[in-house]
Amino acid sequence: IIVVLEKPKKLPKRPNFSCGPCVKRPGWSLDNLKSFEVLGRSHRSQICLNYLNDVIKLTKETLDIPEDFKVAIVPGSNTGAFEMALWSMIGPLPVDALAWETFGSGWVNDIKNQLKINDLRIHKADYGNIPDLSLIGDDTDICFTWNGTTSGVKVPNANWISRKRKGITFCDATSAIYSQKLDWEKLDVTTFSW
């Protein structure tokens, strides 16, 4: 079902759209940084390690990530994180890959054409729709985007992911992480940018 809405009469103060959380908050400035002493320093320096550890701790607390889950900060934003996970973990089992917008389609392309996973089932839907989630297997790895930034379509919840699954769930949660409740117990690898 496609719903056509009226064009809004009220525009945002900053009407430039970009996918993901790219824009700084109103009033943000470099002057808000606690310290410039970390600029140009190695991430291995003690001061930078302290900042990184603080950010990781706050991220877990803010998002209610279970205590036994690991959080890491990696280069390359969400794309870097998702690619690292795919390239190092996907493949021994069959793969169910879902796509209904730009980012999910990109992950499907990588799995099919770069990683060349042979036992791949692609669940694709047109923009504005979502694939039939009841077709996802219990004995497969699952690759999906929780909320399709470019299409505005999201999975309703994680009920379609079996608690008895044998595979790994790879979830691109960039546009969902701070706005929707995620079922962490069903998400093995969850990536996002901020």
Residue ranges and their predicted role:
Residues 12-14, 69, 139:
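Sequence-level motif detector for i,i+2 pairs with an aromatic at +2
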Residues 31-34, 55-59, 131, 165-171:
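A broad, low-specificity signal for short, low-complexity segments enriched in glycine/proline
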Residues 19-22, 48, 143, 171:
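Generic recognition of cysteine residues
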